[in-house]
Every structure is written in structure tokens, then in C-alpha cells.
Amino acid sequence: MRILVSNDDGFHAEGIQVLAMELRKIAEVIIVAPDRNRSAASSSLTLVEPLRPRHLDNGDYCVNGTPADCVHLALNGFLSGQVDLVVSGINAGCNMGDDTIYSGTLAAALEGRHLGLPAIAVSLDGRQHYETAARVVCDLIPKLHHQLLNPREIININVPDLLFEELKGYKVCRLGYRASSAEVIKQKDPRDETIYWIGPSALPEDESEGTDFYAVKNGYVSITPIQADLTAYHSLLSLQNWLEQEFTK
């Protein structure tokens, strides 16, 4: 098996290096990742400047682009040979609930899905036990690879920041919800000009049993299938009825 590994925290982040080291015990691995932190880049592509992949001595690449750029280039450009699976992570911090809208970690996996490959995104609910998340991925891949990895979906995995032996198990979950985002942070720069920072993530609003928030909070690895189709199917009929009523008066 040949695995393409990417992330949004950047090539030099601890999470991706720990993940690649563990995956190389079970597969051939090549990293193609951003050359710096690209957190919250979502699925953005770079269209107004050239992308410059830098080939490193060990065969990996870092790119002056977004996570989606990295996977797009790797699978649709310069990377030769067959790739069987895309794994994105390990993200420093969870990607649960509404986080998935912004996540560059998920975006890298979704780009792999868009290009026809099964893909996994993995995040750690903290910044300490990356080796736990890496072991979780290596434990799941042989079980998932041939059966449940649909090229039209990705698997989103969130791991509690615990020792591997302290994990309570795995739970298949839906996404939870966060409350409205916190206010932006207003400051003054050294020139006394006003600047703003995006505030921290809001607290969970729906962390009921069955959600990814609930699972991770209670020591379980959450596993959530994610699709790119954003259609609200439950609203199609009501919108169709509204359209017919409003325009047939």
C-alpha cells in the first residue's frame, strides 16, 4: 500500500511527522504538505501565484500552498506512481462539529476523495499524545481500507489526548454543533493602528450522546463519515412546494 500524507499545520509539525513514522511501519508513505501552518484554510486552492513543490532529501515534499493544493498537485501533477490512500493529520486540536467547515485537515482528505481516492482525516484533541492518534490510524486502516472507505466520502477521526492504553474504544458518531463564534479580538499594533484576530472556537452547543463531542469528551475515538455533498435533502420538498405556491398564484 502507498499512502499520501498531508496536513494543515505544516510539514514540520509534530503531528504529521509522528503519523508518517508510524504509517511507514505498515506502508510506503510520501508526505506532501504545506511549507508553513495553513490552519483553517478549508478547501481553498491557490490560483493567483505559482506553486513551488520543494523536494526534500528523504523523498518528501513541502509546498508553498494550502492543504488542498498539496493533495491536488500530488495526485494530479508531479507525483508519479499509484497512491492507494490519502491520510491527513495529525491535526493539533480537534476537528469536530462546525470545525469541519474550516478545517484544512479535512480539506486535504476531501481533495483526495474528489480525485477518486479513499481518505482519512485525523485530529488530536490536544497537543501531547500524537503517538496515540498515530496508533489509532494504523489500527484502523487495515480494517477500513477494503470495506468502508468510500471514494465519495472521507472518514473523520478525532482522538482524545490520552495514552493509547487509556482510550475507552471507538464510536461511530454524527457531528455535533458549536455555539456562535466568539467575538473577534481587537488590539492596537505598535503604530497605534487597530488590528483584529479571529477569536477562539466557541464551546459545543450540542455534545449529546451520539455526537463526536460526546465521544471524545468521554474518552472514545470518534469516527464520522463526511461527504462533500452539502445538499439539505430534508428541505428539498418544502422548498419545491414553496416555489410552486409562490409562482403559480
UniProtKB/Swiss-Prot annotation:
GO MF term set: 3'-nucleotidase activity; 5'-nucleotidase activity; exopolyphosphatase activity; metal ion binding; nucleotide binding
Cofactor(s) listed in the protein's UniProt record: a divalent metal cation
Enzyme class: hydrolase
GO cellular component, one term: cytoplasm
Positions that bind a divalent metal cation: 8-9, 39, 91
Organism whose genome encodes this protein: Haemophilus influenzae (strain 86-028NP)
Protein name: 5'-nucleotidase SurE
Keyword Metal-binding among UniProt keywords: yes
Places the protein is found: Cytoplasm
